Amino acid sequence: MLTILKNKVTTEHLEFEMPDGFIIKIDPITKDIGMQFRNAEDTIHLAVYDDVYEEDDDYIKEDIEFIREDGFYDLMEGPFEIERCGKKGLGCVYRTKGHQFEFYEARFFHRGTSQNRETDIVISTDIGESSPIKSVKYLFDIPGIKEFLKKIVIHS
């Protein structure tokens, strides 16, 4: 069971402070999720592609190169394979430089369909509804994700 220590709703995003030190920020429109440690200088984002097949690899590689060339981003890891709800997809972890968190700057899209906001970054409609709290728990159900992100933050 996920415990929410603090829930602050603003006009821009939902913010949750987690027991393990993560601050979760969710954009209610694009469903982008950002993760940040208390006092961290960088915001860590996890982008997940659901149902990505081999023929999409070129598009994903182009997307990653685009982020690498953009000075605002620092790609940390990926793409790597993630399995959720029995489905396999590709994911990638990256961070925005500095304290500012900008949801509209997210550049990963599900199979290239940037118009389909429901299949954008991280939150999937596989869980039956786009409830932020359920989606945060869903994200943290990914095996090893917390340890993976902690390692990135500590050593970056």
Give the location of each predicted region.
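Surface-exposed amphipathic alpha-helical segments
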Residues: 22, 121-156
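Short, solvent-exposed coil/turn segments at beta-strand boundaries
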Residues: 17, 21, 39-43, 85-87, ...
